[in-house]
UniProtKB/Swiss-Prot annotation:
Interacts (via coiled coil) with TRIM44 (via coiled coil). Interacts with TRIM28; this interaction prevents TRIM28 activity on BCL2A1. Interacts with TRIM41; this interaction prevents TRIM41 activity on ZSCAN2. Interacts with BECN1. Interacts with NFATC3 and NFATC4; these interactions prevent NFATC3 and NFATC4 nuclear localization. The gene is Trim17. A zinc finger (B box-type) spans 94-135. This is E3 ubiquitin-protein ligase TRIM17. A zinc finger (RING-type) spans 16-66.
Length: 477
């Protein structure tokens, strides 16, 4: 008997016929057959519920020979326990070395199914037409293939580990850069905050000095006028009393009275209202912040006054054709003034746009926002009550007239580049000079009554041009 056959026989002896695995706690029945204790007990438990011939009390049939065996006569087989343990530990006696179907040694390898088979499997219908190699030959062939795969996978593992190391380094460097940038942002903003606090203090000090100086001059002027008024009152009273006297009495003192009147020095200081405030409200960096809300605002040619020309510089064409070839009287077109509104209306959010102004010294113009339903056929006052929130400059005056009876904003120079900021939810529209970043004026109210449109207006052909985004606007002469 060769070693393989001996191993097979030994494996059979160490295998339970119920679970087909090596014995665990083997016991022997009265008839001499061996089973795992748990396997034979489970087999007999299942047999209790089956109908059949009457069994002796406490006796059950042997699963191998069907001979009746008392349950209490199960005897532990310690020798078989050692044999089963040896079979488990011996590499040549593993269960996987035998065919699970035929219990024959696995000596062949099916290349089609890529699985070991026994000689009985080789002749079976399932493998009869398959390519089959001896197990050792197949092992050598597949070992080479596996070694190639191992080499490839090790190379890939090295690449992966290299990339992992690079990614970890990149992650560390990135986190460090983020940390540095965060610290830099906090540091720079702290500098800006300190700078703004100092700038605020400086501007307020300048304004306070200007207030004190101007207030002193105004108070001195007022005091002088008060003194002059009292002197005039006194002389006037004396003259009125003297005119009521008898002729002789009146004429006796007339020389002194006239002398006092002639000696009175009259002073009339020039009073200019409103007094111009020289201190400019300029917040450093504010225009840059507002530009984060910048919109591409373009005038709507269908709303433009018939003689208001819109020229698109990029496309090199008129957006609104000259009046000779247009139909000027559409319902959306402004007819009372050389005005136009933007193509897009705003009913929420924050929006900022800029307008360049190449205007003459006596230009008439207006900028701002208006309701989408303002009167376009009639001349109306451009006021919030009529749906206009605009600033305007007229006839070269260096101030922006706003509302009737309001104090106009005084300018050192008319702006050539203006910014308009609309905060719809806050009910506020503000105007800035982009040239120096100064704030010119703001309209504030609880809420706007409806959608708003950017508003542009030129007064006459002599006013010059406005540039809105890439569109140039002027009045045809």
């Amino acid at each position: 008997m060769d070693a393989v056959e001996l191993a097979r026989r030994l494996q059979e002896e160490a295998t339970c016929s119920i679970c087909l695995d090596y014995f665990t706690d083997p016991v022997m029945t009265a008839c001499g057959h061996n089973f795992c204790r748990e396997c034979i007990q489970m087999s007999w438990e299942k047999g209790k519920g089956k109908k059949g011939k009457k069994k002796q009390k406490g006796s059950f049939p042997c699963p191998e020979c069907r001979e009746m065996s008392p349950q209490r006569n199960l005897r532990p087989n310690r020798l078989l326990t050692k044999v089963a343990e040896m079979a488990r530990q011996h590499p040549g006696l593993h269960k996987r070395d035998l065919c699970q179907i035929h219990q024959e040694p696995l000596k062949l390898f099916c290349q089609d199914d890529q699985t070991p088979i026994c000689v009985v499997c080789r002749e079976a219908q399932e493998h009869r037409m398959h390519r089959v190699l001896p197990l050792d030959e197949a092992a050598r062939e597949y070992k080479l293939r596996l070694e190639e795969d191992i080499k490839y996978l090790r190379e890939e593992m090295m690449k992966t580990e290299t990339l992992q190391a690079k990614e970890e380094q990149t992650l560390t460097e990135w986190q460090e850069r983020v940390k540095e940038r965060r610290e830099r942002i906090l540091e720079e903003f702290q500098k800006v905050v300190l700078f703004l606090v100092e700038e605020e203090r400086r501007l307020l000090q300048i304004l306070k000095k200007e207030e004190d100086d101007t207030l002193g001059k105004l108070q001195d002027s007022k005091a002088s006028l008060d003194h002059q008024s009292r002197s005039l009152d006194l002389i006037l009273l004396q003259l009125e009393e003297q005119t009521q006297q008898e002729p002789l009495q009146m004429l006796q003192d007339v020389k002194d009275t006239l002398t006092r009147k002639e000696s009175l020095s009259m002073q009339y200081p020039e009073v200019v209202l409103p007094v111009a405030i020289k201190t400019v409200c300029r917040v450093p960096g504010q225009i840059e912040v507002l530009k984060s809300f910048q919109e591409d605002v373009v005038p709507d040619p269908s709303t433009a006054y018939p003689y208001l020309l819109l020229y698109e510089s990029r496309q090199r064409r008129y957006l609104s054709p000259p009046p000779e070839g247009s139909a000027p009287y559409s319902k959306d077109r402004f007819l009372a003034y050389p005005c136009a509104v933007g193509q897009k209306s705003f009913s929420s959010g924050r929006h900022y746009w800029e307008v360049g102004m190449n205007l003459t010294g006596d230009a008439l113009w207006a900028l701002g926002v208006c309701r989408d339903n303002v009167s376009r056929k009639d001349r109306v006052l451009k006021s919030p009550e009529n749906g206009f929130w605009v600033v305007q400059l007229s006839k070269g005056k260096k101030h922006l007239p706003l509302l009737p009876n309001s104090i106009p904003v005084t300018l050192t120079e008319p702006p050539s580049h203006m910014g308009i900021f609309l905060d719809f939810q806050a009910g506020e529209v503000s105007f800035y000079s982009v040239n120096d970043g100064s704030h010119l004026h703001s309209f504030s109210q609880v809420a706007f009554p409806g959608p708003l449109l950017p508003f542009f207006c030129l007064g006459s052909p002599k006013s010059g041009q406005m540039v809105i985004s890439t569109v140039t606007m002027w009045v045809k002469g």
